[in-house]
From Swiss-Prot:
Recorded metabolic or biological pathway in which this protein acts: Protein modification; protein glycosylation
UniProt similarity note: Belongs to the glycosyltransferase 11 family.
Keyword set includes Phosphoprotein: no
Keyword Glycoprotein: yes
Name listed for the protein in its UniProt record: Galactoside alpha-(1,2)-fucosyltransferase 1
Membrane topology: Single-pass type II membrane protein
Amino acid sequence: MWPLSHRHLCLAFLLVCVLSAISFFLHIYQDSIRHGLGLSILCPDRLVTAPVAIFCLPDTPMSPNTSSPCPQHPASLSGTWTIYPDGRFGNQMGQYATLLALAQLNGRRAFILPAMHATLAPVFRITLPVLAPEVDSSTPWRELQLHDWMSEEYADLGDPFLKLSGFPCSWTFFHHLREQIRSEFTLHDHLREEAQSVLRRLRLGRSGDRPRTFVGVHVRRGDYLQVMPQRWKGVVGSSAYLREAMDWFRARHEAPVFVVTSNGMEWCRENIDASKGDVMFAGDGQEASPWKDFALLTQCNHTIMTIGTFGFWAAYLAGGDTVYLANFTLPDSEFLKIFKPEAAFLPEWVGINADLSSLWTLAEP
């Protein structure tokens, strides 16, 4: 037998090192598959238009104005939960918050789908990781449609792979995590600064003074003008309701200014009394890019909302006093089967009853 040279020994040592490294990474990959982590994760530190499957490494640096780039799940969590991203901006905020809360409650890892990331990540510093489409399509999901209030059975869901659906937006799911939810829905700096710049430029009409108290007003119009009376036997916020809500704030706060946003700004200018000089029509009404109006509302001190999840989230994040439109459907409305007012509005919020006279007239034989 030929004696091994020093060169041969070095080559053999390098070969052993390479094989050991390959074996180590294969072990990690197989272990991740076995524990439900056979997932390709999209790092949501930027808007991804063509998702690719990558593994995020811990402690990846991120700028202060981006979403968290990698999963932040505690090691004790297991399984994989996600939720269908359905509806528009406010709907998807509700779905995100509910997924996060229920997954934590049940000790599961939460992931969002790329469509939800595309809706929310440009606006907020969200941290939930994104599930790659190929993983979504190959996972053996059990599906569960949620109703819009917390139920006891949702606290004990044993499914390791669960895909939720529905339009949950009730504080009963996530209010115990309010500070975490508010952190998830922190605006990116440029949106917050732009909104604050708009507010700084506002002046009270009669005195020219800079206001100290800002009341965000969200007036939902658009498709709800037909949907509410025709499908749900309901109404949207009227000019009389808005006047009463504004008077409520005028009676309790010194010289407030009302910052009006809506997807029907023309109606607002024609129907909201601005003669006192304290009403500012600041919204741009662009439904395709709602984040400017939303950012403006969240930077106000208080909120007047009409109906809809957009107004709910503006009020929830702004804090302060909130006035909402109450009893906006007839008692026999099918809407009340899927909507519980006590689960939709925080107990400390103030409700002003809607005027249903137009609906009673239509209901008469």
